[in-house]
Amino acid sequence: MQTIKCVVVGDGAVGKTCLLISYTTNKFPSEYVPTVFDNYAVTVMIGGEPYTLGLFDTAGQEDYDRLRPLSYPQTDVFLVCFSVVSPSSFENVKEKWVPEITHHCQKTPFLLVGTQIDLRDETSTLEKLAKNKQKPITMEQGEKLAKELKAVKYVECSALTQKGLKNVFDEAILAALEPPEPTKKRKCKFL
């Protein structure tokens, strides 16, 4: 059975672990526990063939900047996550996350993933953002950044409601199996 390695990166508290737990167990975790490094595996059927989707959760906190890249070798696709209600996590996609993964894995495809879309219309969240003269990140802003950074595409979801959740992983699988440059093997390698 072929394995697809998918590594999830992004700032702390943007919902990476919830995304993975909600997808793999259909349950939403009730409390926040910062991740050091976790992995999950699910079997998916693609064109009648079984694949193992290996999902690697990483810690977004700066304390783990040197440890995190140890999970990158042999990655088939990255999910670069930000919260649509955290403009700073959106900025860090460009400032930190994409530079980090492209430094280690230049040719590995990645998706830009907007998380926590259920909070985009929540009154208390909008009030907190407004106090800092901020607004939620829009679908258009996500698509624009994805294009600018050469992501395979922009997708968004809610781990809480599961809206768009399956699509994130379907698109990740497609990106891993159908890389845009079919002549080159695009797994991440450390030299």
UniProtKB/Swiss-Prot annotation:
Compartments, as annotated in UniProt: Cell junction, Adherens junction; Cell membrane
Propiece span(s): 189-191
One protein family per Pfam: Ras
Protein name: Cdc42 homolog
Modified residues (Cysteine methyl ester): C188
Gene name of the record: Cdc42
Organism of provenance: Drosophila pseudoobscura pseudoobscura (Fruit fly)
Enzyme class: hydrolase
InterPro entries: Cdc42, P-loop_NTPase, Small_GTP-bd, Small_GTPase, Small_GTPase_Rho
Membrane topology, from the record: Lipid-anchor
Protein family according to the UniProt entry: Belongs to the small GTPase superfamily. Rho family. CDC42 subfamily.
Classification via PROSITE patterns: RHO
GO BP of this protein: ameboidal-type cell migration; anatomical structure morphogenesis; cellular process involved in reproduction in multicellular organism; developmental process involved in reproduction; epithelium development; hemocyte migration; maintenance of protein location; melanization defense response
Catalytic reactions on record: GTP + H2O = GDP + phosphate + H(+)
SMART domains named among the record's database cross-references: RAB (SM00175), RAS (SM00173), RHO (SM00174)
Example of a GO cellular component annotation carried by this entry: cytoplasm
Keyword tRNA processing: no
Amino-acid positions noted as binding GTP in the UniProt annotation, renumbered to this chain: 10-17, 57-61, 115-118
Keyword Transcription regulation set for record: no
Covalently lipidated residues, kind S-geranylgeranyl cysteine: C188
Short motif Effector region, span: 32-40
Keywords (A to Z) from UniProt: Cell junction, Cell membrane, Developmental protein, GTP-binding, Hydrolase, Lipoprotein, Membrane, Methylation, Nucleotide-binding, Prenylation
